[in-house]
Amino acid sequence: MAIVKCKPTSPGRRHVVKVVNLELHKGKPFAPLVEKNSKSGGRNNNGRITTRHIGGGHKQAYRIVDFKRNKDGIPATVERLEYDPNRSANIALVLYKDGERRYILAPKGLKAGDQIQSGVDAAIKAGNTLPMRNIPVGSTVHNVEMKPGKGGQIARSAGTYVQIVAREGSYVTLRLRSGEMRKVESDCRATLGEVGNAEHMLRVLGKAGAARWRGVRPTVRGTAMNPVDHPHGGGEGRNFGKHPVSPWGLQTKGKKTRSNKRTDKFIVRRRSK
């Protein structure tokens, strides 16, 4: 893994910082685990924009990643590490002893030739997946389930992890990167170690075009628009004279958006601001 700062041979390369990993596979992905990935342009089934600033970008194929890690008792060998355009983390192609291949999230330190395993009998080492009742308190884990058997949902981005801080009854208490402490059933699975490719946060795209390759469109301020386009638009000068709102007139900046009261009881401590 190397951090490369480009020489300023042009305005577009002046600020570019790349993360180069020579261990990544340079060929095509494993075809049986690849699906077509259609772009939405940020529109829903009515054709209306639901998420702004999305559109265009290079065509990408979706890699089917195994977040459940439910192939118990069968050891697997890591064949290679690969780039995945759909996520910040790298992925690993693993070959199970029975001949099946799957993609998994590549933990920190995993390399080709390593052995991994899932299930209650798996060793306590990075890359192995166990129910959290079988993982020692204080361990660092990633790809954590919120419901048993549903598949990992917490800590899947590059460099992320969760710490198991307590075990009480049928629940374990987790400390998330945000500072939140929450309870999860101890039968939920997690993978030991932290997600690899932590250097992803150090990259600098360097130019607007690099964002467009990724399907990200420009973000235009509401005050720079006309009244027909945004509640902040129009007027003389730059003051819009009201509380900040979204393009649809809903209050923004500080308004609470979480309405899931059903799971509030599992949050021991709110995330730190």
From Swiss-Prot:
List the Gene Ontology MF annotations in alphabetical order.
Answer: rRNA binding; structural constituent of ribosome; transferase activity
**Which SMART domains does the protein's record reference?**
Ribosomal_L2, Ribosomal_L2_C
Is this entry keyworded Ribonucleoprotein?
Answer: yes
- Record keyword RNA-binding present: yes
Q: Name one Pfam family in it.
A: Ribosomal_L2
The cross-references to InterPro entries, in alphabetical order and at most eight, read:
NA-bd_OB-fold (IPR012340), Rib_uL2_dom2 (IPR014722), Ribosomal_uL2 (IPR002171), Ribosomal_uL2_bac/org-type (IPR005880), Ribosomal_uL2_C (IPR022669), Ribosomal_uL2_CS (IPR022671), Ribosomal_uL2_dom3 (IPR014726), Ribosomal_uL2_RNA-bd_dom (IPR022666)
Q: Name one GO biological process term.
A: cytoplasmic translation
Q: Where is this region: Disordered?
A: 32-53, 221-273
**SUPFAM superfamilies (alphabetical):** Nucleic acid-binding proteins (SSF50249), Translation proteins SH3-like domain (SSF50104)
**GO cellular component terms listed in the entry, alphabetical order:** large ribosomal subunit
Sorted alphabetically, the keyword list is: Ribonucleoprotein, Ribosomal protein, RNA-binding, rRNA-binding
Which ranges are annotated Low complexity under compositional bias?
39-48
Membrane-spanning residues: none
Q: Which HAMAP family match?
A: Ribosomal_uL2_B
NCBIfam families documented for this protein:
rplB_bact
The UniProt similarity line reads: Belongs to the universal ribosomal protein uL2 family.
Q: How does it assemble?
A: Part of the 50S ribosomal subunit. Forms a bridge to the 30S subunit in the 70S ribosome.
Functional summary from the UniProt entry? One of the primary rRNA binding proteins. Required for association of the 30S and 50S subunits to form the 70S ribosome, for tRNA binding and peptide bond formation. It has been suggested to have peptidyltransferase activity; this is somewhat controversial. Makes several contacts with the 16S rRNA in the 70S ribosome.
- Protein name (database record): Large ribosomal subunit protein uL2
In its UniProt entry, the species of origin is given as Erwinia tasmaniensis (strain DSM 17950 / CFBP 7177 / CIP 109463 / NCPPB 4357 / Et1/99)
Q: Which gene encodes it?
A: rplB
